[in-house]
Amino acid sequence: MTAPDPIRAAFEEARATLDAFLADPKNVDAVHRFARAAADTLKRGGLLMSCGNGGSMCDAMHFAEEFTGRFRKDRAALPAIAFSDPSQLTCIANDFGFDEVFARSVEAYGKKGDLLVAITTSGNSPNILRAIEVAKKKGITVVGLLGKGGGKAKELVDVPIVVPRAETSDRIQELHIKVLHIAIEAVERELFPGNYGES
């Protein structure tokens, strides 16, 4: 009997997670709402902000750089920032505590009509919950990229996008980056239709 191939099994598990996500129409609708909120924010001259811990911070940075740089084709730079500056984060953590590292940044940069993408695989990261709290007080729309049922964040954000089925952060993050890329493409298609052969 041939032993199971763990590498193939990992790909199969990733596919099963995506299939579970697509099986619920509410999930695709939430990504539409995310893309619409981001496009509307940019049309108003607002700022896209993002934050996360560990691998989710990498996703937050990836999201922002696709706007300030480009996604697929050259176009005007768009205002987006990930709260990932080491000196800023360590200053805030040292002086105010780690739970405040993103909240202080939202307080500093965010204004009514902006958008915050809050990324947490558990939905319960205290510093993400604090950032959401501050954002809501300022009239900032919050999209949550979440996992494991959505945690506390699910009830706090305007647009919760919860990865189903997955038990581990890596599987959750794999779907988060798909959601981010697809939302970015949707925003580009609206703001720069010529880049996609659309009028």
Regions found by a protein language model. Name each.
Residues 1-26:
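Generic N-terminal amphipathic, Lys/Arg-enriched alpha-helix
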Residues 169-199:
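A charged, well-structured terminal subsegment
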Residues 132-136:
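Surface-exposed amphipathic alpha-helices with a cationic face
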Residues 45-46, 113, 139-140:
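Glycine-centered short loops/turns at secondary-structure junctions
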Residues 145-157:
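Short, glycine/polar-rich helix-capping loops at beta-to-alpha or helix-loop-helix junctions
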